[in-house]
A protein has these predicted regions:
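Compact, glycine-rich, soluble single-domain proteins
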Residues: 1-89
């Protein structure tokens, strides 16, 4: 992420053209994050809670996903099976 701070309810949404197994790590990340792995239908299929800042171990999705949402740890209470709805507004 390479940011020193993030505001409440801000995050990063990673979007790919295809669904694949995705890998992340926390190098250069100054705060803990929750990662939401989302399939091509917008359904959360896996949640990795409280990934530790600066941890260089890989976080690997268990299924193929098209989207990953990173949020500051604890900011949103989304669970496996919830839908993600995106708007450009």
């Amino acid at each position: 992420m390479n940011r020193e701070k993030i505001e409440t309810n801000e995050g990063m949404l990673f979007i790919w053209e295809d669904s694949e197994i995705r890998e992340f790590w926390m190098k250069n990340t100054y705060f803990n994050l929750d990662l939401f792995f989302i399939n091509q239908y917008g359904v959360i299929v896996e949640v990795y809670k409280n990934a530790k800042a600066f941890d260089e171990r890989k976080i690997i999705s268990k299924e193929k996903v098209k989207f990953v949402l990173e949020m500051k740890a604890g900011d949103i209470k989304a669970n496996v099976g919830d839908n993600l709805i995106c708007s450009s507004n």
